[in-house]
Regions:
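Helix-loop-helix units of permease transmembrane domains in multi-pass membrane transporters
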Residues: 78-108
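Secretory targeting signals
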Residues: 34-37, 54-59, 107-167
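Short alpha-helical transmembrane interface motifs in multi-pass membrane proteins
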Residues: 60, 68-73, 108, 136-141, ...
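Terminal transmembrane helical anchor/hairpin motif
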Residues: 41-54, 175-239, 246
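Long, hydrophobic alpha-helical segments
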Residues: 58-81, 116
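Hydrophobic alpha-helical transmembrane segments in multi-pass membrane proteins
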Residues: 22, 26, 65, 108-125, ...
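Hydrophobic alpha-helical transmembrane segments of multi-pass membrane transport/permease proteins
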Residues: 19-41, 62-71, 175-179
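Aromatic- and glycine-rich beta-strand/loop motifs that create alpha-glucan
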Residues: 1-25
Length: 246
């Protein structure tokens, strides 16, 4: 446990001492603020959707574009940079396992990712001053944010174990996220296979987040996201083990 906490602490220090981290945080909050202002302005117009502001904020399409960019940026250096600089060999000669290294890096990246979302709580209280807030839906929305973050960080971490180049790692992660988001597009091609179409519907991340934003927590969605997260952490560990012997 001490080894794991040491790795988490090491990675968090690396994050918060990097100029890129603050650039990502500033850009993320600026875009989130702009999105919130646009949603408030749009829904305040007469005759617009009865959807709540927070539901539109968390369940809207633009929400996903943040993930496509942010997740690769915060994970691309995790292993790729250490492999390039040779520090991964030094780390693995310490009394730690590959599993501890991967888990520690995953936890640190997830903590950093979640820290990006903490300031958005301000928007919840802004809405509360003007209208009633469904706290169940708010809690479910942030649960969705955390689950999606865990999934996308684990995918980005896996991408980072596959190369020594941070940019290539980011491109691989970005491509992987496009594939995950693109699952619903396959739905229209499955006319005859009802069971396959149902499976695709179950893997529709857009619908998952739309449900979370409404306060609907489907355990199948939770299991799906946690299962994929576990799979990518497992693959990251195995990839690091293979890299150790190259």
């Amino acid at each position: 446990m001490k080894a794991l906490s040491a790795i988490v602490r090491r990675e968090l220090i690396a994050y918060f001492s990097s100029p890129l981290a603050y650039i990502v945080m500033a850009a993320f909050l600026l875009l989130q603020g702009a999105l919130f202002a646009l949603i408030v302005g749009y829904l305040s117009q007469p005759g617009q959707s009865s959807m709540s502001i927070l539901q539109a904020f968390f369940g809207g399409t633009i929400f996903f574009w943040f993930f496509l960019v942010v997740a690769p940026l915060i994970t691309m250096r995790l292993v790729a940079e250490e492999r390039r600089s040779g520090t991964i060999e030094i780390l693995l000669t310490a009394p730690v396992t590959e599993t501890q290294v991967i888990t520690g890096k995953f936890v640190a990246a997830l903590v950093f990712y979640l820290s990006l979302w903490l300031p958005t709580l301000i928007y919840v209280f802004i809405v509360k001053t003007q209208a009633s807030v469904d706290w169940g839906a708010v809690a479910a929305s942030y649960l969705g944010v955390a689950l999606f973050g865990a999934l996308f960080v684990s995918l980005g971490l896996f991408a980072s174990t596959l190369t020594r180049n941070q940019i290539i790692a980011a491109v691989i992660a970005f491509t992987g996220l496009i594939v995950l988001f693109g699952v619903p597009l396959v739905r229209g091609l499955m006319v005859s296979s009802t069971w396959l179409a149902a499976a695709v519907d179950h893997a529709d991340l857009w619908q998952h987040m739309a449900d979370y934003s409404k306060g609907i927590v489907d355990t199948r969605h939770v299991v799906y996201e946690l299962s994929l997260t576990g799979l990518f952490i497992f693959l990251s560990t195995k990839s690091l083990e293979l890299a150790k012997w190259r």
